[in-house]
A protein has these predicted regions:
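A conserved structural motif in NAD(P)-dependent oxidoreductases
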Residues: 225-236, 247
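Catalytic loop of short-chain dehydrogenase/reductase
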Residues: 89-91, 118-189, 200
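Conserved NAD(P)H cofactor-binding loop of Rossmann-fold oxidoreductase domains
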Residues: 82-90, 100, 126, 261
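Short, flexible catalytic-loop segment of classical short-chain dehydrogenase/reductase
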Residues: 198-208
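Short, small/polar-rich loop/turn modules that mediate ligand/substrate recognition or access, typified
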Residues: 192, 251-253
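Canonical Rossmann dinucleotide-binding motif of NAD(H)/NADP(H)-dependent dehydrogenases/reductases
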Residues: 1-29, 33
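Conserved Rossmann-fold cofactor-binding substructure of NAD(P)-dependent oxidoreductases
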Residues: 60-76
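Rossmann-fold cofactor-recognition segment
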Residues: 45-63
Length: 275
């Protein structure tokens, strides 16, 4: 009997939490660029009783993503795909961020869109930064949504992006657009695709950002939010479980903002939770 396959791309804090929440009774295919972290995570989950297969991947290379999608299909019915892999401004240059966070998402949507099982669902982990990006004109948004993945990084306006922070927010806005555009193709396979935009989450990447140059601003945003706290990987795993599950059967091509109210406070000038 064919097993259902959960694919988790990116095994950082959120990826691990999602794998634990969703993986019981499924074959779990873990993928990451960092083979040392990938191996340690796979071994840890196996020790907890999960059925785990590990595969290295470079999400910025189509051949690598295609091979991962093919591997997933060989393991069983690909019913759940979660893409968490990404780089942040403190970790990489603008060019690297665009290659991983923009092109990587586009490649995952295309390659897994051809193997996802009917009734399956996918979630792309984006960021609240996508809501804070500098405005794009309609032509730029159409280009980010519909340009073939292999041509994305050649868009002329992307050549002007030299700041990691700008590249990150633009890539995350593009994630929303690519998910919207991909929802039709996924729907024709009887599957759904959505994204989640976390706020500041207590993961290794999140803590790196808090320790970086923008940490003070990030803490200020948290203080003025409704929740008044950092998010946890479990918060994101819970939102992911909803979007992968039957209660969201009529939800596709949309983004779920899970930021504790940061964007709402920024847009409305709301007083802090502690006020």
């Amino acid at each position: 009997m064919s097993m259902n396959v959960l694919v988790v791309i990116g095994v950082g804090g959120m990826g691990q939490s999602i794998a634990r929440r969703q993986g019981a009774g499924k074959r779990v295919l873990l993928a990451d660029f960092d083979e040392q972290v990938l191996g340690a995570t796979a071994e840890s989950l196996r020790g907890e009783g999960y059925d785990v297969v590990a595969s290295p991947v470079d999400v910025s290379a189509r051949a690598s993503v295609a091979a991962l999608a093919d591997r997933a299909a060989q393991l069983g019915g690909v019913t759940e795909v979660v893409h968490t892999a990404g780089l942040s401004p403190v970790q990489a240059s603008a060019a690297a961020i665009l290659a991983v966070d923009l092109l990587g998402v586009a490649l995952v949507l295309e390659e897994f869109g051809r193997v996802v099982a009917p009734g399956g669902a996918g979630v792309v982990i984006s960021s609240m930064a996508g809501y804070l990006a500098a405005p794009l004109d309609a032509e730029q948004e159409r280009a980010l949504a519909h340009t073939p993945a292999d041509e994305l990084l050649d868009l002329p306006f992307l050549a002007q992006v030299t700041s990691g922070a700008v590249g990150y927010s633009l890539a995350k806005r593009a994630n929303h657009l690519r998910v919207q555009a991909a929802s039709g193709a996924w729907g024709r396979r009887g599957a759904r695709i959505n994204s989640i935009s976390p706020g500041v989450v207590s993961t290794p990447m999140g803590r790196q950002e808090l320790a970086g140059d923008g940490g003070e601003l990030m803490r200020s945003m948290i203080d003025t939010s409704a929740a008044g706290r950092l998010g946890t990987p479990a918060d994101i795993a819970a939102a992911t479980a909803f979007l992968l599950g039957p209660d969201s059967a009529f939800v596709s091509g949309t983004d779920l903002l899970v930021d504790g109210g940061v964007v709402a406070a920024l847009r409305t000038g709301a007083p802090s939770a502690a006020a």
